[in-house]
Each structure stands twice: as C-alpha cells, then as structure tokens.
Amino acid sequence: MSDAHGVARDQLRAFIERIERLEEEKKTIADDIKDVYGEAKGMGFDTKILKKVVALRKKDEQERMEEEAILDTYLHALGMIESPPEG
C-alpha cells in the first residue's frame, strides 16, 4: 500500500473515531435532557408544554408570528376557532 493510501486510511479512521465520540456525547446529552424533563414532571410541570416552549424559544419573533398566523388560518378554516373581531 502506498504512503498516500496509508495517510487516507488514517484520516478516515480519525474522522470515524471523532464521529463515534460525538455520537456518544450526543447520547449522553440526550439522556441528561430526558432526566431534566423527568425532574420537571416530578415537580408538576407538563413536559409537552415545556418542549413546546423550548422549541418556541429557538425561533425568532417574526417566525413565531408567521406560524401562529398560519395556524389560526387553518384552525379557522376547520371551524375550530372563530374569526378575530374586525376593528
């Protein structure tokens, strides 16, 4: 095997090992997050709502407002909410 192939093999192995380490860290973090949700649930918090709040906080205000407007439009079309009063 040429030296170039050996270098490529070593680089590939290094990438794979880094990915494996990061995947393990990701699993550890996911387990930690699950534990926090469990702790919050034990204190009486609704974990579904907590997850929604976390997701909303990731979005900027404009994006949230656009999504809420579209949701309202869909709910209105399905008769699930009334039209907002026109002023």
Swiss-Prot record:
Molecular functions per Gene Ontology: DNA binding
InterPro entries documented for this protein: GapR-like (IPR018753), GapR-like_DNA-bd (IPR046367)
Lineage top rank: taxon: Bacteria
Residues that span the membrane, as ranges: none
Stated family: Belongs to the UPF0335 family.
Protein name: UPF0335 protein RHECIAT_CH0003797
Annotated source species: Rhizobium etli (strain CIAT 652)
Lineage of the species this protein comes from: Bacteria, Pseudomonadati, Pseudomonadota, Alphaproteobacteria, Hyphomicrobiales
